[in-house]
Amino acid sequence: MAGVTAIEIPQWIQDNQGDFVPPVCNKCMFSDQLKVFYVGGPNQRKDFHLEEGEEFFFQRKGDMVLKVIEKGQVRDLVIKQGEMFMLPARVEHSPQRFANSIGLVVERERKNTEFDCVRFLVGSSNVTLFERWFFLTDVVKDLPPLIKEFYNSNEFKTGKPGKGTFACNAPYEARWTDLPVPINRKEFIYDHISEVKNGPVKIYGAPEYKTEVMLLGEGSYDLEAGAVELIIWLQENTFAVVEESGFTYALKSETMVRIKPNTKCLLNVKGGFAITIRMPG
């Protein structure tokens, strides 16, 4: 099926377990319009990241701490095992990962007019010590030179802002907003068992987010990716069938399915639940 790619998550994680420990700590499953990757640890980051898109987090194993700047204050947002969280766009964040933990992250590709920022702060304050704005194409290639530049800077050596703190005017300001609390995935499913029998249930979406995350129960669904990719994430103890362009593909539980842009398919969930993720620009 040219428009559909399916990967069994448990086997994929087992096959790539060497990438979830230092120094790599992550492995990309899909890397086109949607960046779908899993992250391990330990990995205690010192920098904060700022981007114009939203990020979806799910902790498969163990907890993580997402350091955020919320209304000007640095705080620790804990995402526990089994919890989901949608980070709004333009919120400064710094993921802190621990040993023997694995988490899912989904984000979209950047437009050629969008900029990311890597920012270091003075101690535990919200004062900027060093920042660089850049166009992100490949985090593995683009980020290390900026980190190296910081550690070679006078700002790092003195711990005080200086002439090298800012290299340009900020293209945009960080968002000043209250952040939501993480959602326990299993509790959400249990709380919406009756509702999902009547159709898809919104987990995240408009008007708060551009990203659309939906819960699907048993039944048949005509799905269309549209101009962006669509992710179908089969949950535990779920069996489903996807039909696309005359092909039929039986899906096991805990399978991640990518539907390419402008692709239509029929999803038949015969038992259990699925979560879909779409991230327009």
UniProtKB/Swiss-Prot annotation:
Reaction catalysed by this enzyme: 3-hydroxyanthranilate + O2 = (2Z,4Z)-2-amino-3-carboxymuconate 6-semialdehyde
GO biological process: 'de novo' NAD biosynthetic process from L-tryptophan; anthranilate metabolic process; L-tryptophan catabolic process; quinolinate biosynthetic process; quinolinate metabolic process
Coiled coil region boundaries: none
Pathway(s): Cofactor biosynthesis; NAD(+) biosynthesis; quinolinate from L-kynurenine: step 3/3
Keywords tagged on the record: Cytoplasm, Dioxygenase, Iron, Metal-binding, Oxidoreductase, Pyridine nucleotide biosynthesis
Pfam families membership: 3-HAO
Binding site for O2: 45
Annotated residues for binding of Fe cation: 49, 55, 93
Record localization: Cytoplasm
Enzyme class: oxidoreductase
One MF term in the entry's GO annotations: ferrous iron binding
Region named Domain A (catalytic): 1-162
Record: residues binding substrate: 55, 97, 107
Enzyme Commission identifier(s): 1.13.11.6
InterPro entries xrefs: 3hydroanth_dOase, 3hydroanth_dOase_met, RmlC-like_jellyroll, RmlC_Cupin_sf
Signal sequence interval, chain numbering: none
Linker, as annotated region: 163-179
UniProt key word Cell division: no
Cofactors that this protein relies on: Fe(2+)
Cited HAMAP family: 3_HAO (MF_00825)
Function: Catalyzes the oxidative ring opening of 3-hydroxyanthranilate to 2-amino-3-carboxymuconate semialdehyde, which spontaneously cyclizes to quinolinate.
NCBIfam families linked: anthran_nbaC (TIGR03037)
Family (UniProt): Belongs to the 3-HAO family.
Name listed for the protein in its UniProt record: 3-hydroxyanthranilate 3,4-dioxygenase
Phylogenetic lineage: Eukaryota, Metazoa, Ecdysozoa, Nematoda, Chromadorea
Designated gene of the protein: haao-1
